[in-house]
């Protein structure tokens, strides 16, 4: 039987070409396996398994009780194959490719809003400064109800990107619904929109600077260098680098950031893998002559990958103090391989090691489910604090640091998650209740406080505001006992104040409140 006769599917007596093409790839992969390995016994076993897989796909397609979407089935088979390797090798479909690539880009073309879909409409979380949306006066809380005179009700996130993004210089008309005014339309000319890695940069006091970094993308090192320079001009004598909940990104950006602070020829990182070109050592190239001030790196269990490269290098080279929780423990190097159909495979080719030789990667021997559930284990830090079973490594100056996965901080500060269930539901509610309540307070705050500094010093979430908030919350299907209201009000009140700061003065102001 030839390839063409094997790889067919029936749909109302028509051949589905795309499925036929994908099944053909399975057969061709089988042939390629034989060509690579020859006809030894191992290759014959692999050949038999691939042949079995092809037979199963054909049987499912012809006999399953309901009609199946073969593309979905085949994608699932590919994902299942990569899942068997490790938690971070992954398959990227053609549809996913563009959005995943954007995680590493420094810009896109569009109107410049951070948004969420709430009550069926695009809701502006905040306009990005110096973009068409901010220049047109869009505000946090605005709802986009029509796009080019078509209803935007129940729009999907995918459709938002398709309708609001577009080439620089092209135009889009949006109709805005704003509390207290009639609906109005604005024509926006699309532009290049920066995607910032540095969310906030400011002086905490006269000597300490603070930089919040949320990812490692193509512009991250450059953004941090700019922030450092600006803070130095304000008199900064030490810096706090906040990498909490930063899931990582581009390895080269992490290396460039460490390189700003360490001595020339210090080892920043090394990698080890099975193939020769996956083994490498990365050395510092610059002198820290103008970056010799103290550094504190903040991490938590959400700090992963490139965040662990930075925090691990600062710790091992005795260049900074690491504070917070033990980090995620993702120390696998992925290389992305483009595939002929526009999809891609991201495959682990090596492991990261810190300068002292610590492997960053946590064990995943017990499976992916345990691998991720370990992160929310409340006893994770308690067990880590004993450090009894963990290997010991030495820093550049001879201090003990601990291996075993992730970066263990020099000073452990527990993340305060001791909320009541009602408070946790409030903070994570799908309808973003904190955002909505802050949006209702926004106009009064703008009228009362002319500057953020006055707001920060004088706006208090007092007992009167507490009563008003819980009265507002009564019809939102969230119940709070009286004791819960008292015990958790400082957290809830702080989040409301921070959201107000973000809506009116931007993200740096929000982090000053938090």
What does each model-found stretch correspond to?
Residues 37-49, 53, 57-70, 123-126, ...:
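Cleft-lining beta-strand/loop regions that shape enzyme active-site pockets
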Residues 306, 318, 325, 329-387:
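Polar, glycine-rich mid-to-C-terminal structural blocks
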Residues 8-46:
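Bacterial Sec-dependent N-terminal signal peptides
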Residues 64-125, 171-190, 195-200, 514:
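Extended, small/polar residue-biased N-terminal targeting/export presequences
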Residues 359-360, 364-514:
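Conserved functional hotspot residues or short segments at active or partner-binding sites
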């Amino acid at each position: 039987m030839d390839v063409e006769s094997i790889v067919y599917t029936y749909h109302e007596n028509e051949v589905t070409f795309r499925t036929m093409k994908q099944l053909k790839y399975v057969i061709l992969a089988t042939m390629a396996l034989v060509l690579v390995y020859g006809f030894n016994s191992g290759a014959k076993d692999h050949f038999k398994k691939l042949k079995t897989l092809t037979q199963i796909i054909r049987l499912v397609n012809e006999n399953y009780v309901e009609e199946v979407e073969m593309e979905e089935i085949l994608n699932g088979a590919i994902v299942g194959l990569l899942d068997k390797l490790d938690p971070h090798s992954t398959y990227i479909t053609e549809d996913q490719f563009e959005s995943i690539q954007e995680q590493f880009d420094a810009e896109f073309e569009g109107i410049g809003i951070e948004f969420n879909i709430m009550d069926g409409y695009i809701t502006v979380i905040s306009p990005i400064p110096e973009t068409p949306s901010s220049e047109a006066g869009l505000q946090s809380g605005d709802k986009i109800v029509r796009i080019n005179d078509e209803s935007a009700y129940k729009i999907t996130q995918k459709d938002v990107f398709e309708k609001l993004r577009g080439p620089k210089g092209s135009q889009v008309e949006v109709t805005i619904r704003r509390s207290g005014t009639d609906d109005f339309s604005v024509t926006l000319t699309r532009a290049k929109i920066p995607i910032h890695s540095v969310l906030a940069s400011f002086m905490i006091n006269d000597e300490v600077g603070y930089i919040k970094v949320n990812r490692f993308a193509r512009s991250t090192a450059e953004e941090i260098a700019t922030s450092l320079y600006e803070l130095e001009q304000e008199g900064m004598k030490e810096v706090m680098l906040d990498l909490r909940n930063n899931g990582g990104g581009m390895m080269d950006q992490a290396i460039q950031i460490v390189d700003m602070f360490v001595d020339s020829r210090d080892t920043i990182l090394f990698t080890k893998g099975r193939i020769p070109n996956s083994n490498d050592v990365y050395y510092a190239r610059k002198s820290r002559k103008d970056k010799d001030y103290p550094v504190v790196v903040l991490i938590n269990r959400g700090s992963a990958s490139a965040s662990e490269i930075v925090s691990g290098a600062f710790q091992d080279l005795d260049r900074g103090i690491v504070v917070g929780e033990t980090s995620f423990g993702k120390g696998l190097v992925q290389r992305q391989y483009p595939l002929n159909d526009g999809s891609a495979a991201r495959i682990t080719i090596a492991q990261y090691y810190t300068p002292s030789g610590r492997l960053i990667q946590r064990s995943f021997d017990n499976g992916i489910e345990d691998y991720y559930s370990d992160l929310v284990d409340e006893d994770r830090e308690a067990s880590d604090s004993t450090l009894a079973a963990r290997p010991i490594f030495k820093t550049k100056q001879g201090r003990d640091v601990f291996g075993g996965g992730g970066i263990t901080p020099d000073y452990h500060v527990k993340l305060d998650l001791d909320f009541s269930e009602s408070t946790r539901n409030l903070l994570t509610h799908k309808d973003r209740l904190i955002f909505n309540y802050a949006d209702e307070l926004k106009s009064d705050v703008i009228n009362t406080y002319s500057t953020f500094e006055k707001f920060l010093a004088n706006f208090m979430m007092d007992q009167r505001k507490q009563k008003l908030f819980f009265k507002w919350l009564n019809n939102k299907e969230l119940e709070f006992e009286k004791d819960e209201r008292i015990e958790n009000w400082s957290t809830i009140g702080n989040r409301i104040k921070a959201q107000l700061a973000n809506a009116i003065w931007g993200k740096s102001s929000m982090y000053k409140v938090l």
